[in-house]
């Protein structure tokens, strides 16, 4: 059985919205996009590379998939582009229909939670969820998240969409490992307690 691992860049106040670019996600007037970029270093790059090497597929929400599909195929000089292109990318959406334009992208049809359970039951390497906040919360509600890799950045954004929101089901996590980058980002790995 495969595990579902959620990997997220978050601020100290739990914001996960638009870590990579100013135009990545401007919903609700969010104007602080790209906040994680100044904290990137070799330690983070190595950790992310190791995580991607252990990944057998990506599971993305519609909005994150659309953002990635519009960005990554054009990043021809980025070493992560061929890795992302090669991975199967499953998209949880009730509005997207196949075939999807980004190579190896597949919409999950029918009930997304049932489809994710089927993916999880297959043999193979772990499934990584990147971004996709609403999907992460839904997976968590259904007991489908097996672990988190949280890149906790040393800044407070004061607003924006959060990984965990008020009203989310309480739950305990167990820290399995952590490393601190040269820029003060704590990369913490957790699994449900």
Task: Mark where each language-model region is.
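Portal/gating segments that form or line small-molecule/metal binding sites
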Residues: 1-144, 154-193
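Periplasmic plug
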Residues: 147
